[in-house]
C-alpha cells in the first residue's frame, strides 16, 4: 500500500486484501463467466487469480493492484475496449469462437460482479452495463428508475433493450469511486445503527 488515504473503504474496515480481491471477481456460478475464462485460457480460475489477470481494475472505480517492482500505471490497466462483451452477455458459439481466437485478454468482464449475465459495452466513449433480464426484471428496474426520477432523486440512467436492460456507468468512467453499500453497513444488515 503506497497511500492509506487512497485505500478502498472495504480494506480500511476489513484489512483483508484477499477478501477484497475475491469480492471483485466475476460470479463463477454464471455459465457465461465459465465460458469467458475458458476462452481467455486462464491457467488459474479461482477468484483472486481471475481478478489479478486484470490487476483488479473495474469500470466503476480507480482501485487496482500492481505487482511489486512493476512500473504499471492506472492508464496501463484501465479498460479501453469491450471485445469480450458479447460472450459475457450471450455466451453463444460465435462469441466464444471469436474470443477464443483473440490475442486480447484484458476485459472488464472479469471484474463485473453479480449473479445476472451481463457485460460492459463501450458506446460513443461511454460505458454501459447491459444485463440480461426477463420482462418482470426489466419492469422492476425501470419502475425504480422512473419512480426515483419523479421523486427528484439523482438516478443512474436505465434504458430498456430487447432481452436486456442497460444502464449508463454512473461513475462516468470512474471519475468517482463506487463503494458498495455493504462497505458502509458491514454486517449490520438490519440497518439498526
Which residue stretches match the model-derived regions?
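Phosphate/dinucleotide-binding and metal-coordinating scaffold of catalytic cores
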Residues: 1-193
Amino acid at each position: 500500500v503506497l497511500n492509506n488515504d487512497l485505500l478502498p473503504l472495504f480494506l480500511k474496515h476489513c484489512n483483508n486484501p484477499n477478501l477484497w480481491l475475491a469480492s471483485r471477481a466475476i460470479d463463477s456460478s454464471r455459465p457465461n463467466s465459465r465460458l469467458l475464462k475458458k476462452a481467455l485460457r486462464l491457467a488459474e480460475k479461482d477468484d483472486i487469480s481471475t481478478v489479478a489477470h486484470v490487476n483488479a481494475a473495474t469500470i466503476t472505480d480507480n482501485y487496482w493492484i500492481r505487482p511489486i517492482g512493476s512500473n504499471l500505471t492506472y492508464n496501463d490497466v484501465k479498460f479501453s475496449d469491450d471485445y469480450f462483451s458479447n460472450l459475457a452477455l450471450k455466451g453463444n458459439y460465435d462469441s466464444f469462437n471469436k474470443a477464443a481466437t483473440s490475442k486480447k485478454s484484458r476485459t472488464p468482464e472479469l471484474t463485473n460482479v453479480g449473479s445476472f449475465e451481463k457485460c460492459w459495452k463501450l458506446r460513443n466513449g461511454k460505458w454501459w452495463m447491459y444485463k440480461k433480464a426477463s420482462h418482470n426484471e426489466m419492469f422492476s428496474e425501470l419502475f425504480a428508475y422512473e419512480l426515483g426520477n419523479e421523486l427528484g432523486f439523482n438516478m443512474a440512467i436505465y434504458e430498456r433493450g430487447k432481452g436486456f436492460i442497460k444502464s449508463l456507468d454512473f461513475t462516468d468512467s470512474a471519475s468517482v469511486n463506487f463503494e458498495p453499500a455493504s462497505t458502509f453497513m458491514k454486517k449490520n444488515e438490519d440497518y439498526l445503527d
